[in-house]
UniProtKB/Swiss-Prot annotation:
Phylogenetic classification of the source organism: Bacteria, Pseudomonadati, Chlorobiota, Chlorobiia, Chlorobiales
Functional summary from the UniProt entry: Catalyzes the ATP-dependent conversion of 7-carboxy-7-deazaguanine (CDG) to 7-cyano-7-deazaguanine (preQ(0)).
Pfam families for the chain: QueC
Broad class of enzyme this protein falls into: ligase
Source species of the chain: Chlorobaculum parvum (strain DSM 263 / NCIMB 8327) (Chlorobium vibrioforme subsp. thiosulfatophilum)
Cofactor(s) the protein requires to work: Zn(2+)
UniProt name for this protein: 7-cyano-7-deazaguanine synthase
Family per record: Belongs to the QueC family.
Encoding gene (name): queC
Length: 227
């Protein structure tokens, strides 16, 4: 069975890739450049992850229109990337409006063409920044969209293997699968050393610290987010 992987180059998509590989799928990987601040580093990590898992079928998509639409600190230089707020409940400025729906639509199109039956995405609901398009209900609904919007003979299902996991659990599972975390990038701000203070860096650092494992990525600062 063939699976399309949405691989950003981040920690979650890496572990989702490791799981799909572990389950024996024939893998095809998609990466989307949507004008994000760290697009070059993320693309580099995508290629390294694909090389590591021997994924030859790859699709790199330019979705710069999401950057042109704006509305997110990830794509708009005029909107600063705020510091981590791990206890916050508001949707942060890093939310890219309806981004994952756009990604999934492209993945479904490609899956129909190449005959893939599964789409893996490393979405996390329980221990995330509160993005509305990272909720299980969203993916359940999108599976209905696929069913009603593709050919009758098409059978494609979105798989979200990490959706109910904490970031610490994701790190543990990745270590069990020998996932190459050094090929992943989570920082929202920097392509050199990870900043260590954005929300994504904070959640990653806290996860690694929670399981007592050193994050192999180099940081400008490594605050203690377990306090």
């Amino acid at each position: 069975m063939k699976a399309v992987l949405l691989v950003s180059g981040g920690m979650d998509s890496l572990v989702a890739t490791a799981l799909a590989h572990h389950h024996g799928f024939e893998l095809a990987a998609m990466h989307v450049n949507y004008g994000q601040r760290t697009w070059q580093k993320e693309l580099e990590c995508f290629r390294q992850i694909c090389d590591h898992y021997g994924i030859e079928k790859r699709l790199e998509i330019d979705a710069g229109f999401l950057g042109a639409i704006g509305g997110s600190s990830l794509t708009d230089a005029a909107i600063p990337v705020g510091p981590a707020d791990l206890a916050g409940t508001d949707i942060p400025t890093s939310y890219v409006p309806f981004r994952n729906a756009n990604f999934l639509s492209m993945a479904v199109s490609w899956s129909e063409v190449i005959g893939a039956n599964r789409i893996y995405i490393g979405a996390v609901e329980e221990d995330s920044s509160g993005y509305p398009d990272c909720r299980k209900v969203f993916y359940d609904a999108f599976n209905q969209v696929i069913e009603h919007g593709t050919r009758p003979e098409t059978s494609i299902e979105i798989v979200t293997p990490l959706i109910d996991m904490s970031k610490a659990e994701i790190v543990k599972r990745g270590m069990e699968l020998d996932a190459p975390f050094h090929f992943s990038w989570s920082c929202y701000k920097s392509e050199g050393k990870a900043c260590g203070v954005c929300d994504s860096c904070a959640r990653r650092l806290r996860a690694f610290a929670s399981v007592g494992i050193a994050d192999p990525v180099e940081y400008e600062v490594r605050p203690d987010y377990l306090q």
